[in-house]
Amino acid sequence: MTEPVAARVTLGYSTTADRVRNVAPPPEDPLLAVIVSVQNPSETDWRSTLPESLTARGDVTFFEQVAWGVAKSRNLVLDAAETEYLLFADDDVEFDWPGILEGLALLDADPGAGMLLAAARDEHGRLRKDYPASVVPLTLRNSGKAATYEMLVRVPDVRARGIRFDERFGAGAENYLGDEYIFCADLLKAGGRGLHGPVVVAMHPDDSSGSRWGTDADRRARAVIFDRVFGWKAPAVRLAFGLRRRAELGGVGGALRFTLGR
């Protein structure tokens, strides 16, 4: 009798009670498991709204958290995953299953790598940002624009190093940016290693919290990320970043306030 194939990768969705119906994983596959973490502080009845496309599947597990915070939600998924690999997800992401399999193959070939920071397209089929032309080591510099749905992690490695999302950052927190970059930075600073490459694993619409620039709140939120990652070196790093991105920060004055963390 042939042994059943064990799932190798979990898609870990973070969503809210009023949006959980939007979750749309790839078709069922023996290698795939799905976890959906539902933020539901109001304790509303979201289960009755689930479409058959979710309820009829045998590979989906739901968890509920009675609190806001996407980082909390992603940590719940990280704790619950039972597969070697985990790819984080939002409820408006469409995944490319062949691309995910390509990402698994890259990590299989490099067992010392704790994660792959992959690539994504927008709804028009365009790459969402500049990605390296080939697979390169993950660094503090090239992981600065990390998006959660690009992060394919080796679960035992990140758990062994105690890497989690900092719940003071990310959507639903006052510091609503930076949770992904901080995760990557913490992995690297803990002695871990990662890969970054042009393997397209997802499609995500162009508009997101990571694409907002120019407001005072945005500038301050970005400044705090540098404090968290670079500590006492943060002002110097912010200065270099601010000079490069002064237009997005609101001109020279905005870049100066950013450098000072204001």
Write out the residue ranges for each language-model feature.
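N-proximal low-complexity "stem/linker" segments adjacent to membrane-targeting elements
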Residues: 1-33
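Acidic donor-binding segment of Leloir-type glycosyltransferases
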Residues: 23-64
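Short aromatic/hydrophobic "clamp" motif used to bind/position activated sugar donors
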Residues: 86
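Non-catalytic, C-terminal membrane-associated alpha-helical segments of glycosyltransferases
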Residues: 213-262
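Conserved donor NDP-sugar-binding/catalytic core segment of glycosyltransferases
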Residues: 97-131
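A short, conserved alpha-helix in the catalytic core of glycosyltransferases
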Residues: 151, 157-161, 168-197
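Glycine-rich, basic loop-to-helix element that forms the pyrophosphate-binding segment
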Residues: 64-81
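Active-site donor/metal-binding and catalytic loop motifs
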Residues: 171-175, 192-213, 222-225
